[in-house]
Amino acid sequence: MAGANEGDAMSADVKYHVHLNREMLAGAEVAILPGDPGRVGKTARYLDPEAHFLASNREFTSWLATLDGRQVLVCSTGIGGPSVSICVEELAALGITSFYRIGTTGAIQPDIELPCVIITTGAVRLDGASTHYAPLEYPAVADLELTNSLVAAARELGLPHRVGITAACDTFYPGQERYDTFTGYVPRRFQGSLEEWKHLKVLNYEMESATLFVIASVFGLKAAMVASAIVSRTRSETPDDAVLAQAEENLARVMKRALQLRGTARS
């Protein structure tokens, strides 16, 4: 099956940003969404050593894997809600009905050990993109079936994991109250927010889950989120290379087993 690249002419039914069409997806109904394009091939090959490249355009790189006889798409989204919204819109139009977001994260709760697996049940909507689909009163919640598959996988694999609420921000620095920035200043609305989320039992920060959950719910689709903590925000801002490598391996293991437990592409 031929792949596509940024220079290829747009053919019929190829979506503008992801450069994919239904034929390329070969009936896939499940998509795994890492943020980093560099993780796509690794994730796909963990599911299937024969996985192959499909397309790459801007932040959207995609590979197709086969797991237990069913097709699974792995497609990067880049960072943040706006690019996630583009990816979900275009993949949904191509027949994807279930979305698993995977990524790394910063732990808020000080008792979370690295690289703990964190499975999100709902997100604090600190993003802007989700408000273009539903008002702030609308909850950002994960699909129960997909979430349960992740929890069951983590338990079966014996991996330390936590299940709960995530703070989903539009920005990596001020929105997550980081002071190691160009100016060193955090706007007043975010000053003290890390401590507040800690007291409200929010587990972690990331940047995509709220947008993904809201869009999936509005569209009648399914979405879940699993991340691996690579920093503890109450102790450090810089991830260790060994922790990062273990985090990526843990995510791949959990994701593969969750798909197997769920039946891979059953919607």
Please place each PLM-identified region on the residue numbering.
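Glycine-rich beta-alpha junction loops
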Residues: P37, G106, A167-Y173, T211, ...
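Flexible, glycine/charged-enriched surface loops at secondary-structure junctions
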Residues: P49-S56, G158-I165, T264-S267
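Metabolite-binding pocket within alpha/beta catalytic cores that recognizes anionic/polar moieties
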Residues: A2-S149, A153-E156
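Generic non-transmembrane alpha-helical segments
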Residues: S149-L157, I215, V254-R262
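A C-terminal functional module that forms or caps the active site or interfaces directly
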Residues: Q191-A224, I230, R235
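His/Asp/Glu-rich mid-to-C-terminal helical/loop segments that flank catalytic regions of hydrolases
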Residues: R233-S267
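Short acidic/glycine-rich loop or secondary-structure boundary segments that cap or lie
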Residues: I108-P110, L126-G128, D170-E177, T234
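Active-site rim beta-loop-alpha module in soluble metabolic enzymes
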Residues: V141-K201
